[in-house]
UniProtKB/Swiss-Prot annotation:
Source species: Salmonella typhimurium (strain LT2 / SGSC1412 / ATCC 700720)
Compartment list: Cytoplasm
Residues noted as binding Mn(2+) 1 in the record, renumbered to the chain: D200, D277, E279
Effect on the protein upon substituting K310V: Reduces the ability to hydrolyze Asp-Leu without decreasing its ability to hydrolyze Leu-Leu
Similarity annotation: Belongs to the peptidase M17 family.
Cofactor(s) named in the record: Mn(2+)
Substrates-to-products reaction catalysed: Release of an N-terminal amino acid, Xaa, from a peptide or arylamide. Xaa is preferably Glu or Asp but may be other amino acids, including Leu, Met, His, Cys and Gln
Gene of this entry: pepB
Residues annotated as binding Mn(2+) 2: K195, D200, D218, E279
Protein name: Peptidase B
One MF term in the entry's GO annotations: manganese ion binding
Amino acid sequence: MTEAMKITLSTQPADARWGDKATYSINNDGITLHLNGKDDLGLIQRAARKIDGLGIKQVALTGEGWDTERCWAFWAGYKGPKGVRTVMWPDLDDAQRQELDNRLTIIDWVRDTINAPAEELGPEQLAQRAVDLLCSVACDSVTYRITKGEDLREQNYMGLHTVGRGSERPPVLLALDYNPTGDKDAPVYACLVGKGITFDSGGYSIKQSAFMDSMKSDMGGAATVTGALAFAITRGLNKRVKLFLCCADNLISGNAFKLGDIIRYRNGKNVEVMNTDAEGRLVLADGLIDASAQHPQLIIDMATLTGAAKTALGNDYHALFSFDDTLAGRLLTSAAQENEPFWRLPLAEFHRNQLPSNFAELNNTGSAAYPAGASTAAGFLSHFVENYREGWLHIDCSATYRKAPVEQWAAGATGLGVRTIANLLTA
């Protein structure tokens, strides 16, 4: 059996022969990471990516200085979508080791689920995986209902049914109730709503291959909020939280929805479809209507919703939108505490009015006259949140997935956002 490569930490610079910018050096005892006190977690993550790139698949984190955050930074960079990697973790106290183990279980579940091929992960499989994860951490406190196919139409979940009807795999709504109180009448503290588009071709507004090749990841919002709830439970969440996952394929067929169709929602809103590739907001609307009906203190929806958010922030930050400044500040505080990247983008009352339609109350996409696509998408969603000015956060999760490797991440899912939402839920 191959001996594990030892990885140690040092606050001293590397030997001059390695250059003045060296972040790691190799010696007879293994590899030393040279911390400079400026961005130590980022340095560790980038070094781990390089170590993986060397083909080293077994490592042992040894010596002084390792804690949960540094171990996790190493794993975030070391983990990749192909092959098996083995890490021997340093000695940590019980609380730190439990926190690390929970991250390894839950956030790796999120990354692996998002990376799964669409052929293996359809709407029903995504919903069932979410149930299985949450039952693994709190089954006694979990109840759920799965509604699919024509039952969605009969129950007037018209956005989800319309988007998903073009696929042979029926659309699915997962409504899950985490209620640790044991009281069926306990108030709902928070609702989490996730976009679960298990493959997005764009529909008749079809994507080019260069934009479609990563669309197995269009369910990243659903996976992330599921992981966030599970992770919050491991951190002691004792409040009632409901989860709504809106799962569907967006495909082309003789039964697929078309431009010019009008969707009539249960809250009385009528929406004209002028871009079938703006489908995420159409399915989220159904989940947000259900979430609002619970009258929670907090609603968080999460979705890989717009290319505009990626244009603004790249894949480096999740985009945050809210009318509630206090709540937005709380989430950004949680993000800072968890070392996760979020950035607030504008959402104003006028964005709600930048989706005009000649035939319905709303258009599902903005026109050239209103180019702020991420903000108008958030404005669209606000029409389905009963009290949209208070207690609602929309996250356009542009940092969920990377099509190609970069210096700190392998290609694929990142798992970013799980810890921040869990932190907010348990604050």
